[in-house]
Structure formats: structure tokens, C-alpha cells
Amino acid sequence: MPREKQKRGRRAEDKAKKDAAKRKRDEGPEESAVKRLKPSAETNTSNNEIISGADYIPLGQDDGGNDVPMNDAPANDMPFYGLLDSEEQEYFSKANEVLELNQFHDAEERRLFVDSVYREADGKELKVACSQSCSRLMEKLISLSDMRQIRRLFSKFIGHFLHLVQHRFASHCCETLFINAAPGVTEKISKSKGRKAEVDEEDEPEPELSLAEMFMKVVEELEGNWGYLLTERFASHTIRVLLFVLAGEPVDLSSTDSVVASRKKERLGIVNTEAPEEKAAAEKRKVPEVFEATLKKVMNDMVSGLDNTYLRALATHPVGNPVLQVLVFLELSHFGKASAKDPNSIIRRLIPDDDFGENAESSTFVRGLLYDPVGSRLLETIIKSMPGKLFKSLYKNIIRDRIGSLARNTTAGYVVLRTLERLGKDDLQDAMESIIPEIPGLIERSRLIVPKVLIERCLVRGVDTKPLSDALESAYDKDPAQRLEQMLKLEPAASEDDSEEKRKQTGNNQTAAAEKLHGSLLAQTMLTASGPVSGLIYSSLLAQSPDSLLRLAKDPTASRVLQQALTAPTSTSQFRRQFTTRFSGHLVELALDSSGSHVVDALWPATKDLFFVKERMAQELLNEELSLRDSFVGRAVWRNWSMDLYKRRRGEWASKAKGLDSIENGQRERPKSRIDLARAKFAAKAAEESSKAPVAAKT
């Protein structure tokens, strides 16, 4: 009997099972599902409520919930502008390398190269700006562009700014574009024939809008999203730049206390960029009248939708705090301090009370900012810009009695610095007496910026610095030589047994480098104060051994102290006569060192009244002419000491060394002629008679 074909039967059996399963699903859901399906994001919440057995599940959560758009939050769908292909990536990468090397013969060659890159990027500007690898190239191009190129690029970005300012890479391009376009907001569109011919040759139309009109377009695009962009991590720094441009305020990213750039902003500077444009960006500018009204409206729109509680919460928000600083600064400085009286102003909403009472709302807010790493920066801005009457009340009720303990704190200490800058002579005297007991602890923990600023303010206000000098002297070693080494954090001379690895580890310690820098800045500030404060540094310098002086001169940070000591107005001829001779025999060694060469340069003005010392030093340099000419820093020293003049025309060099020959600097005064002397005599006589006239009339 033939065997049954099992294969065909199994297929039929499987098909029957599938049909049965389909019928079962059509009839009703199974109580126990065999296979778990991954829930979608939209239904995950409702499923959890069903499984957990919630007592109440509101209707309409699932049915038709996706059909209603959410209008409260801005759309998060970032448009995709496309990707650069491999050839384009390679071209722009090479262009970036060329700009980094900056080996152009002249500015014209660099301009032609920038033009060629712009032609290659035509139509791909948005792709380049959003590219992780090429956005830096776009920033460099903008920095090297003229106003015509900036206007063309600006016009390409119009219509996309709402998305670009929120992009991780394109936001930095927008920031650079705003900074470089700011000086041209008052320029009118030129329609010269040469420009028309250039446009026809490049076959690219010139934008019809001026830069001022383009900035207004940017404001229109961002309208209605200010409240969201205020705390958007990529848009925040671009919004700050836009506010400064509208206000005509300088946009200086190199400033240490600038709140314009983002915290992680890279310095993509190019060597030999046009100095006038950089200077224009760092100066206050004239802006069109429409900018002021627009700025006021934008600032109002940013905070009008926020209640006072949320506005104060921005003070400690890492992203919103810098924008709030800019808003407070512009409100108090640009629109006048009288705006602080407006109850709807930002400063009045933050600090509603003038008296700063014990339980006042303003006191609670300010005390909360004092020790907050983020909020203290806003408090610094408020103290710098707030009206005098409000500042006096704040200082009297919150800071004055606690200024010593506040100076000890690493965060509140910066608020103390801003406070010291606004105190009058009497209040500064009292503040100094409160801070002096804390000086030893501050120096022990390398918090040297507080005594540094205190010395500067005492010099400005004319406060006696003798108590401060005594506190500094007691805080350091009694030995003058050790005192300077402690202040500058100088390490003992490295022996031959020290390993190279240990030296590298010491050199890479950022904390030690920062402490050395602050010690050097404190010593330089002390040298500007006449009397016992500068005497502490001068006595320490005279107590140094020759080897120690060489170490000081070759140290990049410590050598600044030597330069300041040689050229400061407090430096006496007696000190310079003793100190300058210590460098004899080591001038060539120092002149060939990158840091020591600056000390040799400082010896030229330091020996202005010590001609015999200067002549001896010049002869020492002349003996090693070949060594100096073979070195870059050596050639600079040779030039600054006018050694060619010393070598060929010794008499002219002597006149210049004594300060008699100042034609080069334009300092020589033309001898007065007889008519000039007669005019001066007549003017003095007329002034004397005019001063006597009121007295005679009164008698």
C-alpha cells in the first residue's frame, strides 16, 4: 500500500490553523495575548492606565487625540536642507585648511580665494551652515567677507532664521553673521557702475534690502517665539547678539566678562583680519531709529508672557540667565536708569522693594543669588547698572555687614568685586577694614583677585593703603626673597634627576597655572601703588639672586612683574640703578628667550636716565650680533634697541638713548618764536585782568 504524502498534508494543516486564528480574531479579542506588541508613544500612557486599573480614565485621550495640533509649543520639526556630497565635503575641507594656514601673499589674494569659495558654495549655503564639519568654514568666511558678500549671504538666510538659530552648528554661523553685519546697518546700498559690472560678471543679483532691513526681517521671523528662544540652548547666544546689534552696543567676544558668546564658543580668529572691522564691532555704533522701537518691543515680548515667579527662576537658569543679564543691562543703560521706576520694567519685577527689609521679597531674591554660581552673575550685572539710590539701599541692608564673609566665598566674592567698584571713599574705607582680617585666608586659598581689586579701588578713591600693606606683609613670608616666590608660585629650580614626565605633569596643571597668573596680576597691581604696597615687591626683587632673576625673566607669567617694575611710574631711579645692573652679562641669553626678550625691551626705557648702563648693555648686545640676527625674538630686541643706529651713527644713538632725539615719536616740541611768546604773554595778562574784574566791581 503506497505511503501518504505527509508534506502536502502539513501545508494544508498549517493553512487551516491560520484560517481558524483569523476567524477567532474577527469574533473577539483573546483574553491572553500570546505575542506582545511594542506600544507606540501615543498609546503608551493610556495602556498603562488600563493595566494599572485606574479608577478614572478621561474620555478623548485616545480617540482623535492625534488630530488636534498642539499650538502651545513651537514646532520641533527641524527642516532638512540636504547633505554635501563627498566631492563638496573634500573641497570645503581643503578650503578650511587653506584659511587656517593663512599663507596668502597679500589681502588681495585672500579676497580672491574667499570669492572662489563663495562661488562654489552658491546655492549650498544652508547645507554648509548646518554641516558639522563645514560650519566652521562658514564662520571664517563671514569673518573675512566684505559688506557686499555679507549682504548676499544674509539674503540667502532670510526665511530660515527661526530654524537656523536653533541648530547646533548653524546658530554659530548666524551669530558670526550678525556680528560682522552690525557695522553696516547704517550704510546705504551703493549702485555704482563698477558694482553693476561686477554683478553682471558674476551673474548674481544684488540683494534689494539693506542690512538694516534684513535685521528687521530677522525680528519678524522670530516674532512670537521669543519666550521659547529665551531658554533654547542653541538659540540663546544668537538672541543675545541680536539684542546688542539692535541696541548699537559693542559686540566684543574677546572680553572676559562678555555675556554675548556661548560658554563653549570657539575662537575661530584668522590672523591679519581687517582691523577696522574688528574695531567697529567692539565700539558703540549708531543704529537706525527704527531699531530702538524694535528693541523695546522685542524686550517687552520676551518677558510679557512670563509671570514674576518664572522671571526670577530665569536668574538661576543656565541658558536663560545670560539673556536676562542682557535684558537688565540694556534696560538700565540703554533706556536710562529712570526706567527702573516703571513697575512693569524687568528690574522692578525682579526687585520690587526699595528698602530691602529683613523679610522683603527683594531681600529673599538677592540673598538667593549671592551664593548661586549662575544667579550671582545676574546680581553682578544688576549691581553694575542699577541706580545709585537702589544700590545704596542694597549695600546697606544686605552686603555691608557681611562683606568680609562674602569675600571669602568663591561665588559671592565676585559680587563683592562689583560692589567695591561702586563704593565711595568712606564706604570703601569701612569695607577695607572688614576685608583685611580675611586677607591671610584669601591668600592661603589663592583668592588673590579680592585684594587686587581692593588695591585698585583704593588708588582710585584715594584711600590709605598702609593697613592693606601690613596685612599683605603678614600673610607672606618675612624673607623678601621668599615672599615673591610665594606670591608667584615659583617652583624650585628643577634638578637633573627630575624626570621629564614629572615636568610635563606640572606644566599641564591648569590650577597651578591659574594661581601663578593671579599672583602675577596681584604683584603688578601692587607695583602701581606708591608707598609701602609697591615697596613689598621692590624689596623682594632686590633680594633675588642672579639665578632666581633669570628664572623670573624666563617665566612667561613672572616676567610681567619684572617688566612692570622696570617701567612703572612708582619705580625710582635709585631702584633702577641697583636693579638694571643685575642683568649685565645675561642680556643675550634673555634676548634669545621668548619671555626674557620682553624684559630686555623693558630695560630700554628703564635706563632712560642711566646712560652709562644703557651704553654698556648695547655693547653687550653688539658683541653677539650674529646670534641675535639668527633668532626671531633676537631680531626684535635688536630693532627695539636701535642697534643699527648704535653700530653706524653712535652720536645719534646717544641722543636717542638720552631722550633728546624724539623726532621718530613726534615728541619734540618746536621752539616758540617771538610772536608765540608775545601771544602767550598777552593771553596770560588778559586772564589775570578778567579774574580781577569781578572783585573790582564788587568793591
UniProtKB/Swiss-Prot annotation:
The keyword Nucleus applies. Pfam families: PUF_NOP9 (PF22493). Its main location: nucleus. Residues 11-27 have a biased composition (Basic and acidic residues). It is found in: Nucleus, Nucleolus. One of its GO terms (biological process) is endonucleolytic cleavage in 5'-ETS of tricistronic rRNA transcript (SSU-rRNA, 5.8S rRNA, LSU-rRNA). One of its GO terms (cellular component) is 90S preribosome. Coiled coil: none annotated. SUPFAM superfamilies: ARM repeat. InterPro entries: ARM-like (IPR011989), ARM-type_fold (IPR016024), NOP9 (IPR040000), Pumilio_RNA-bd_rpt (IPR001313). Residues 1-10 have a biased composition (Basic residues). Residues 41-50 have a biased composition (Polar residues). Pumilio repeats lie at residues 120-155, 156-191, 361-396, 397-433, 540-580, 582-619. GO terms for molecular function: RNA binding. Keywords: Nucleus, Repeat, Ribosome biogenesis, rRNA processing. Residues 1-66, 491-510 are annotated as: Disordered. RNA-binding nucleolar protein required for pre-rRNA processing. Involved in production of 18S rRNA and assembly of small ribosomal subunit. Belongs to the NOP9 family. This is Nucleolar protein 9. The gene is nop9.
